[in-house]
């Protein structure tokens, strides 16, 4: 009789714990994901702002080095949207990037961000673009990208 009572109490507590964990998972996972994404976006923006201090002539030669330091894919885009260098792909086969939402936002505000699917890498990516200016003239953009799958 004591073992049946123990089993009923144990089963009740077990069910309650599973329900509490499920509810916490449902509500906390999106909040944690948003917090982590925001932190990654802020770090990428910081890296992009530092890179944007370089000239458009310097950036393409250092794209691999910059990508390694930022732990992100780096794309150098001229003011017309043509890709001048990319740390992951050959720039000759890449589309014009001027109409990408993060680039358009960077054109208007100096920094632009977007979360969207990359056809090139076939996964959801976080993008940060920073306008590169020389003597107050827009020269192009530094765009950083990281997978949201990581």
Please report, for each region that a protein language model flagged, where it lies by residue:
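Juxtamembrane segments flanking the first transmembrane helix
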Residues: 1-83, 88-96, 107-111, 133, ...
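Membrane-proximal, non-catalytic sensory/regulatory domains of signal-transducing membrane proteins
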Residues: 57, 93-142
């Amino acid at each position: 009789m004591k073992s049946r009572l123990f089993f009923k109490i144990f089963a009740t507590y077990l069910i309650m714990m599973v329900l509490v964990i499920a509810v916490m998972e449902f509500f906390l996972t999106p909040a944690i994901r948003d917090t982590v994404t925001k932190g990654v976006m802020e770090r990428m923006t910081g890296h992009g702002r530092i890179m944007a201090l370089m000239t458009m002539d310097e950036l393409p030669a250092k794209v691999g080095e910059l990508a390694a330091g930022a732990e992100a894919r780096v794309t150098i885009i001229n003011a017309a949207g043509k890709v001048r260098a990319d740390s992951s792909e050959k720039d000759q086969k890449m589309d014009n990037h001027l109409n990408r939402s993060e680039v358009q936002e960077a054109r208007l505000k100096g920094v632009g961000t977007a979360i969207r699917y990359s056809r090139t890498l076939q996964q959801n990516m976080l993008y940060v673009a920073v306008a590169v200016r020389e003597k107050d003239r827009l020269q192009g953009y530094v765009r950083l990208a990281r997978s949201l799958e990581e």
